[in-house]
């Protein structure tokens, strides 16, 4: 199979566990899902042959992931809300509290991620509004079979996905790519573990919307 000339989004759909591989190599398969594997690898000076070999191995492994290309869009929407929207509503307030504690207790340390709590608070506020608009406006349109008429709302949602992707870049910069320093306390380590989980969840969430739900809706499925 020719992997290098396929888009990251298409590969993430065809090979569900490719998302973990892409995340390990900092390959943006959600907001940047339209770029080819070759182009993305070249930008990061990654070995394209090694990536193709890893993808080939993943594709031959058995897996039990849901095939969302075949499921009705109403099922996909229900999954996105229960698995990602509801989860983000639980994750972010707790992450903000932990970040505030780390900055308050360790603010005198050079490794302290100053500004992290404020950035996470901004993500919480904007993502809360974003998910509300999806649940109250866009998703009902799609569920009523009006997805082909939803290009305007979809364009706005994709732009907001790009914006939160940029906010995640700031979080990574503040946290040394979400790596706790030597000697970090338990709260600090738990905070970074939670941030990593949130980033993984959010990237998979955006991938399902940008690369599966929205294109299928626009095709009138």
From Swiss-Prot:
<dbReference type="InterPro" id="IPR023742">
    <property type="entry name" value="FeS-repair_YftE"/>
</dbReference>
<keyword id="KW-0963">Cytoplasm</keyword>
<comment type="similarity">
    <text>Belongs to the RIC family. YtfE subfamily.</text>
</comment>
<dbReference type="InterPro" id="IPR012312">
    <property type="entry name" value="Hemerythrin-like"/>
</dbReference>
<comment type="function">
    <text>Di-iron-containing protein involved in the repair of iron-sulfur clusters damaged by oxidative and nitrosative stress conditions.</text>
</comment>
<keyword id="KW-0479">Metal-binding</keyword>
<dbReference type="Pfam" id="PF01814">
    <property type="entry name" value="Hemerythrin"/>
</dbReference>
<dbReference type="Pfam" id="PF04405">
    <property type="entry name" value="ScdA_N"/>
</dbReference>
<dbReference type="InterPro" id="IPR019903">
    <property type="entry name" value="RIC_family"/>
</dbReference>
<dbReference type="GO" id="GO:0046872">
    <property type="term" value="F:metal ion binding"/>
</dbReference>
<comment type="subunit">
    <text>Homodimer.</text>
</comment>
<keyword id="KW-0408">Iron</keyword>
<dbReference type="GO" id="GO:0030091">
    <property type="term" value="P:protein repair"/>
</dbReference>
<dbReference type="GO" id="GO:0005737">
    <property type="term" value="C:cytoplasm"/>
</dbReference>
<protein>
    <recommendedName>
        <fullName>Iron-sulfur cluster repair protein YtfE</fullName>
    </recommendedName>
</protein>
<dbReference type="GO" id="GO:0006979">
    <property type="term" value="P:response to oxidative stress"/>
</dbReference>
<keyword id="KW-0346">Stress response</keyword>
<dbReference type="GO" id="GO:0051409">
    <property type="term" value="P:response to nitrosative stress"/>
</dbReference>
